[in-house]
Curated annotation (Swiss-Prot):
The gene is rplK. GO terms for molecular function: large ribosomal subunit rRNA binding; structural constituent of ribosome. Disulfide bonds: none annotated. This is Large ribosomal subunit protein uL11. The keyword RNA-binding applies.
Length: 141
């Protein structure tokens, strides 16, 4: 028989640097799971992606065990790295924060494809282009 799920917790944590302090402790403590075990497993799985934020979905079961599902980094983080900027524009339609090429846009879309509601790469590119536009990142040919 399958284990009964008691909750699903979604967190965005720095890769390889999770600690039991907030936000991890309070978010997972209510479910009664071993927070140190989660932190250790998360840090091992994300050690290779150091420097980026990695979203994680923690499924908690009735016997206080859990499974970790890692997602791809947020599109905004990927776009910031590709554009080489610290943060997006505060006024996206007036001030351009940076530029990326269509080739770079396609690379980000391919990386995010698994987590997007898109059936083909062109649809994924449109989703990522919208995120870039809202951040003040201009897409050039």
């Amino acid at each position: 028989m399958a284990k009964k799920v008691t909750g699903v917790v979604k967190l965005q944590l720095p890769a390889g640097k999770a600690t039991p302090a907030p936000p991890v402790g309070p978010a997972l403590g209510g479910y009664g799971i071993n927070i140190m075990a989660f932190v250790k497993e998360y840090n091992e799985k994300t050690a290779s992606q150091a420097g980026s934020v990695v979203p994680v979905e923690v499924t908690v079961y009735s016997d206080r065990s859990f499974t970790i599902t890692l997602k791809t980094p947020p599109a905004a983080d990927l776009l910031r790295k590709v554009a080489g900027i610290e943060k997006g524009s505060g006024t996206p339609n007036r001030k351009i924060a940076g530029t990326i090429t269509k080739k770079q846009l396609r690379q980000v879309a391919e990386q995010k494809m698994a987590d997007l509601n898109a059936f083909d790469i062109e649809a994924a590119e449109k989703i990522i282009a919208g995120t870039a536009r809202s951040m003040g990142i201009k897409i050039v040919d």
